Design a protein with these regions (language model features):
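An N-terminal hydrophobic leader/cap segment in hydrolases
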Residues: 1-31
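Conserved HGGG/HGGXW glycine-rich cap/lid loop of the alpha/beta-hydrolase fold
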Residues: 37-89
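Conserved loop-alpha-helix segment in the C-terminal half of the alpha/beta-hydrolase fold
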Residues: 71, 230-267
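Active-site loop/oxyanion-hole signature of alpha/beta-hydrolase fold enzymes
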Residues: 80-124, 278
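Catalytic nucleophile serine of serine hydrolases
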Residues: 127
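Flexible "cap/lid" loop of the alpha/beta hydrolase fold
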Residues: 131-138, 144-174
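Conserved alpha/beta-hydrolase catalytic His-Asp/Glu region
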Residues: 158-163, 172-226
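Catalytic active-site module of serine/aspartate enzymes centered on a nucleophile-bearing elbow/loop
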Residues: 256-299
């Protein structure tokens, strides 16, 4: 039994596998050793396709949560969806050597890309995963061709106070009922996939490590980022003010496109995304990188 409550590893694996089963036929998985442990990655798409690395949100989002976009994105890309080290999923920290700093996260992702045989990649993330993706683009811009951020948290604006207050009971003493209640509050009338919701509940008590948190990226670093960025925001998000996030991003990022996804909340993404999200992402990722940047000649 975890200090955070009862945890049934078999139930979690079964719930995880049910969501993975929603991925396209032929999806495989690889385990990549890194200095921080073994990283589990779902892989789909043509072997010769341009690489795309997807990072999930925090909590029990897991790599599996990208199932609604996987088919569209894998038409043109070799998709690699990652389970974060130390978070619920199938990645395994190396003892106590999980990432503790932003620099550690950068080192972990560098090692993961090296292990996958990827030099330059398209990169995307949702929520906390978008925060990691943005930090990695700042850390190693030469490895990121194009970047999409799906309702990112703590990148351009803080959390709403009401969001933190509603999350507090679940964070202090997580139970399946509290997880369901919090997600129901944040997503409102958006119907949630029953298997995905069961995975969130099954993760209660998972022996996860404390996630890396920290300040927002430095404004001067964002202004210098020479990477095309697509920022998509949940119109009904209760996590933060989407208008504030978009406005702040436009003042800081030199190559950013912003758009609002109407009728969807933060925690409904990416699995309950509105129709057309996969195509919107695919169109952005199909475009060339910044003119003159390494790897863009002739595109």
């Amino acid at each position: 039994m975890s200090a955070r409550g009862p945890y049934d590893a078999g139930r979690f694996r079964d719930a995880y596998d049910k969501v993975v089963a929603k991925w396209p036929a032929g999806t495989g998985a690889v385990t990549v050793p890194t200095p921080f442990g073994e990283t589990h990655v779902l892989v789909t798409g043509p072997a010769g396709g341009r690489p795309l690395v997807l990072l999930p949100g925090g909590g029990a989002a897991t790599s599996a949560s990208w199932y609604a976009q996987a088919a569209e994105l894998s038409r043109t890309h070799r998709v690699h969806a990652v389970d974060l080290i130390g978070a619920p999923g199938r990645s395994t920290p190396a003892g106590d050597r999980h990432p503790r700093t932003v620099a550690d996260l950068g080192g972990w992702l560098d090692a993961l890309l090296d292990g996958l045989g990827i030099g330059e990649t398209d990169l995307g993330g949702h929520s906390y995963g978008a925060w990691i993706a943005l930090h990695h683009a700042l850390h190693a811009p030469e490895r990121v061709r194009r970047l999409f951020l799906l309702d990112p948290t703590q990148c351009f604006a803080g959390f709403k106070a009401a969001y933190l207050l509603h999350a507090l009971p679940m964070l202090l003493r997580p139970t399946p009922r509290r997880v369901r209640a919090f997600l129901g509050w944040e997503t409102g009338a958006t119907p949630l996939d029953a298997d995905w919701l069961a995975l969130q509940e099954a993760a209660v008590g998972f022996p996860e490590r404390r996630p890396v948190t920290g300040p927002r990226p430095a404004p001067e670093a964002l202004r210098a980022l020479d990477v095309p960025v697509l920022l998509l925001l949940a119109g009904n998000s209760r996590t933060h003010d989407p208008a504030e996030v978009a406005a702040r991003a436009r003042t800081l990022l030199p190559h950013v496109e912003t758009d609002l996804l109407p009728g969807v909340s933060h925690h409904a993404l990416p699995q309950s995304a509105p129709p057309g999200l996969g195509r919107r992402l695919g169109d952005f990722l199909a475009a060339p990188g910044v003119p003159g940047a390494p790897g863009t000649a002739g595109e």
